[in-house]
Amino acid sequence: MSNTGTTGRIPLWLVGTVAGTAALTLVAVFFYGSYVGLGSSL
């Protein structure tokens, strides 16, 4: 296993996981707010 796929000391899979989780959380909060009725105020 080589280390060429990493940027600095942070593995790409960790960056992807964190970014994906944050994106899913934002989408979930947005749809939840829209469902409850607070989405129009964002």
From Swiss-Prot:
This is Photosystem II reaction center protein J. It is found in: Plastid, Chloroplast thylakoid membrane. Coiled coil: none annotated. It comes from Chlorella vulgaris. HAMAP family: PSII_PsbJ (MF_01305). The gene is psbJ. PSII is composed of 1 copy each of membrane proteins PsbA, PsbB, PsbC, PsbD, PsbE, PsbF, PsbH, PsbI, PsbJ, PsbK, PsbL, PsbM, PsbT, PsbX, PsbY, PsbZ, Psb30/Ycf12, at least 3 peripheral proteins of the oxygen-evolving complex and a large number of cofactors. It forms dimeric complexes. It is a single-pass membrane protein. Pfam families: PsbJ. The lineage of its organism: Eukaryota, Viridiplantae, Chlorophyta, core chlorophytes, Trebouxiophyceae. GO terms for biological process: photosynthesis.
